[in-house]
Structures are given as structure tokens and as C-alpha cells.
Amino acid sequence: MKKVESMNVVPFIDIMLVLLVIVLTTASFVQTSKLPISIPQVDKDSTDSKDVLDKKQVTIAISNKGSFYFDDKEISFENLKHKVSTLAKDTPIVLQGDKKSNLDNFIKVVDLLQTNNLKQLYILVEDKKNQKN
């Protein structure tokens, strides 16, 4: 009988590559902003953060001090109105609001988006299950 000198690792490497492909295709890669905003949390599992859009998305953020940000750049509400009016109607908008921000500012932005007929609005929230205690 012939003695086996070394273990064949090719099947192990094949399995690991398949697992790597599965993990990379199912993972949700959403880049969050670098702004100091504390995102509200929800209990639901059905958040649509996995729907990463193919088109160029625009991020509008509201800080807890009432400042507005358009794609990570601070902007006045009047300039925000102008920028939003130039967007295409099918542009996806990601709205980030600090959980301590004024609700009035949030409603102003939503009203501005509705006035400009921008329907693809995504509100960024954090799942409570993912929070570390």
C-alpha cells in the first residue's frame, strides 16, 4: 500500500472560495456619512438598506443643531432648495436625520422633495439589534 505523504488542500481552497463569493454577494455595503449624526433606531427587520441603488444617490443630512448637509457638505436651506430643484426626478435621495434634530427641519426637507416631485426617498435608520450595549 502506498503511503500518503501530504494532504490535498485543493478541495478545501475550492470550498473557501465559494464561501467567500457567497459572503461578498450577500453582504450589504452601504457607506454611511462621516458627519457627526446619531441615527435613529428601529425594531423592524424589514429595513431596505440592502437595496443599494445603481444610480448616483444624493445624501441629505440634518444635524442635531439644525444644519443641513448635501453630500457631506454643509449648506443653507436656500441653497439646498436650489440644489434639489436641479436633480433628476428619478434620483434616489437618502435622508439622514440626527435623532435629536428638530422635526420641523425634517418635515421641511420632505416637503421640499415632494414639491420637486422626487419620489425615491430612503430614510436612514439603524437596526436596534445591531447596536452594541
UniProtKB/Swiss-Prot annotation:
How does this protein sit in the membrane?
Single-pass type II membrane protein
Report the Gene3D superfamilies cross-referenced here.
3.30.420.270
State which ranges are Cytoplasmic (membrane side).
Answer: 1-9
Write down any Gene Ontology CC term: plasma membrane
> Hey, which stretches end up on the Periplasmic side?
31-133
| Compartments where located | Cell inner membrane
| GO molecular function terms attached to this record | transmembrane transporter activity
Matches recorded under Pfam families = ExbD
Domain of life according to the entry:
Bacteria
Entry keywords, A to Z: Cell inner membrane, Cell membrane, Membrane, Protein transport, Transmembrane, Transmembrane helix, Transport
Transmembrane spans: 10-30
What is the name of the protein in this document? Putative biopolymer transport protein ExbD-like 2
Lineage of the organism: Bacteria, Pseudomonadati, Campylobacterota, Epsilonproteobacteria, Campylobacterales
